[in-house]
Regions:
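Generic recognition of short, well-ordered alpha-helical segments
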Residues: 17-20, 51-52, 72
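Thiol-based oxidoreductase modules, predominantly thioredoxin-like and allied folds used
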Residues: 32-46
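Structural micro-motif
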Residues: 51-61
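Local sequence-structure signature of Cys/Sec-based thiol-disulfide redox active-site neighborhoods
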Residues: 1-28
Length: 87
């Protein structure tokens, strides 16, 4: 299973939307619960944020590759889980 990093801002409404989508997807696809997602607040982990190529949050990286950036949709967040589970 691949490493997943989610860059967020604490007060970001789209990040909170992404959390809800993630919870819904885990209910629909129990195997997604096995995916460990490291959630990093760009204000608290500025060195990490500065080392990555993104502008909008939430942004998902799977094994260092940007999979999604910006406004989340169910399909885009599901693609993150699928990328993490892919061989």
């Amino acid at each position: 299973m691949k490493d997943v990093l989610m860059m967020i801002l604490e007060d970001c409404p789209y990040c909170h939307q992404a959390y809800r989508i993630m919870e819904d997807l885990k209910k629909e696809h129990p195997e997604y619960a096995e995916v460990s997602i490291r959630i990093a607040d760009e204000e608290k982990e500025s060195a990490l944020a500065d080392s990555l190529d993104y502008y909008y949050v939430p942004t998902y990286f799977v094994d260092g590759k940007k999979i999604h950036e910006g406004v989340p949709t169910k399909e885009k967040v599901q693609a993150v889980y699928e990328a993490a589970l892919a061989d």
